[in-house]
Amino acid sequence: MPFMTRKLTLVLTAGLTAAAWQPPILAHTPAANLFDAHVALGLPQAFALPRETDDERGPGVDEVVIKERLDTDAAYPDGSHATTYAGTAGSHEAVFTRLGPTLSVSVLGQSVEAGATIARHRSAPAPGQDDVIVPSFAQPARIHAALTDHPPAELRFWIFLHDDAGESNYAKFHNWYVAWWIRDMEKTVKPGIPVKVIIKDHLPGVTDFDYRQGRRDESLFAFRSAADGYLYEQGVMPSALTKVMLFVGDRPDNWKGAYGIAIPRDTVAMASGTGPRHGVAHEFGHTLNAQHEYAETRFPCVTNMSAYVPGLFSCQIYSGQNDVQIREYVQQTVEREAH
């Protein structure tokens, strides 16, 4: 009998220990619960939505209309997936994101950069014109046809959060950089194939990459190699339709004053968290053949490929011509890789 008692005690102890390792179940916020209840009834839905306590616009209540759920998948390092909806908040177009226990709202056409409640100040100038890297003969741009005989059915964007970026709040990162960009890509740019965004962090050899050393073109090529190595390990064949970005904290001296760098019509880019809200969209835009010359100033904001215009905020869209540039690039790349 003592043996049986001890055995039972060990089993119970092991069970309690295993239970202690289960991830905590986080309570959803009141706004998130209200949002979920209305969306569950089917779309569209119109209702009054109180803002989250950390809403970038401050406290308040919005009359919202949730029109549709977007198809684009955004996967985060903890295994969570952002669910993104398009609609309106008041008189403005808006994007609503459910990620984890919270609800985030990104309102287009409103300047919130100066007062945004993000981990650090996000109202820095937009990327300068010196962020485009022209490959040399010694380090050629990637040849699309040589990548893989089986191109993905998706336009994939891998964002690697550098260890020094300080981006541990995935919901805020998604709301600030990704949610509205997903909406624009899916609803306006319309590349013709599905879009997927994958965010990763804490990957030795990738997210601890030393981007401060050497020339910036050397840094880009070296990171592209490191990221491609990781993709191979995960069973993902690099492709001209698979883009990679290193998202860093402070911009290094070797960027020569830019808030990001990219190789046009290639697969690699870098962006700094000290830059503007459209920094990620800007640098990825270069890899999709979007160009500075087609950027527009739409007072009081600038489109994604614009250089710095003092006093203006991010429109959170590409210009009409850059929509065409991206659409044609993707279509031509799909056709090229299919042969």
Model-derived regions, located:
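N-terminal secretory signal peptides that target proteins for export/translocation
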Residues: 1-5
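Gram-negative bacterial Sec-dependent N-terminal signal peptides
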Residues: 6-21
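N-terminal prosegments of processed precursors
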Residues: 10-11, 23-107
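Hydrophobic beta-strand residues in large extracellular and virion-surface proteins
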Residues: 66, 85-87, 94-96, 103-105, ...
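Non-catalytic propeptide/linker segments at domain boundaries
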Residues: 87-160
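Surface-exposed flexible segments
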Residues: 97-104, 115-121, 172-175, 253-271
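Fold-level signature of zinc-dependent metallopeptidase catalytic domains
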Residues: 133-260
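The catalytic-center signature of Zn2+-dependent metalloproteases
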Residues: 263-339
